[in-house]
């Protein structure tokens, strides 16, 4: 994913979050989004991350982050104890995405999910014409070194929400550093969703 797409993604997420609220970022990486939300939205933020180097980077930046595998659950958090739980560029990398979403919805009043759309048209072309697993800016890994375990599309995720009575309060789709308004499952490189239950 390009830095510009990443920045647009963070802007969309920031716009969905109310000022002064509590945020839990699951799979927060180096804390770039957490830092942005603290600075621009004055949120009370905490991150969860598995990667030790990313945790050290977060702590060095003054962020509150602890190490945990979100596949094991969020037992430290009471129901609806956080206003926003974020799963951005994380869902496709966890072993149990259904469990992660349900735990996020249990803990958070609202949940923000963002992921690469594995049915983006350039991915489809690479599979169809080259007969190979796609390598693109949003999916920059070879098949043998990808952290992605689950390959979902925007349509798959919407169907999942419908089946599980999860309300999609807002959605945004990004491609080539701009918003996508039509045929998001084909033209959207990244899907973002604001959820509640």
Regions found by a protein language model. Name each.
Residues 73-79:
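Short conserved loop adjoining the S-adenosyl-L-methionine
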Residues 36-73:
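Class I SAM-dependent methyltransferase SAM/SAH-binding core
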Residues 27-29:
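Class I SAM-dependent methyltransferase "Motif I" SAM/SAH-binding loop
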Residues 84-95:
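A short SAM/SAH-binding and catalytic strip from SAM-dependent methyltransferases
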Residues 4-20:
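Conserved alpha-helix/loop element of class I SAM-dependent methyltransferases that forms part
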């Amino acid at each position: 994913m390009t830095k510009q797409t990443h920045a647009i993604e963070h802007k969309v997420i920031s716009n969905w979050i109310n000022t002064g609220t509590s945020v839990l970022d699951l799979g927060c990486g180096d804390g770039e989004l957490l830092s942005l939300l603290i600075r621009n939205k004055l949120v009370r933020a905490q991150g969860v991350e598995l990667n030790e180097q990313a945790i050290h980077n977060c702590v060095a930046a003054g962020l509150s982050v602890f190490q945990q595998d979100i596949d094991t659950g969020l037992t430290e958090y009471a129901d609806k104890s956080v206003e926003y739980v974020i799963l951005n560029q994380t869902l496709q990398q966890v072993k149990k995405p259904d469990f992660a979403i349900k735990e996020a919805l249990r803990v958070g009043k609202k949940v923000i999910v963002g992921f690469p759309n594995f049915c983006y048209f350039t991915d489809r072309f690479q599979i169809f014409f080259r007969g190979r697993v796609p390598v693109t800016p949003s999916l920059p890994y070879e098949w043998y070194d990808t952290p992605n375990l689950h390959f979902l599309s925007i349509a798959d995720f919407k169907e999942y929400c419908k089946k599980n009575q999860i309300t999609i309060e807002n959605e945004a789709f990004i491609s080539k550093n701009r918003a996508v308004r039509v045929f998001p499952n084909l033209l959207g490189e990244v899907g973002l969703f604001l959820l509640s239950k």
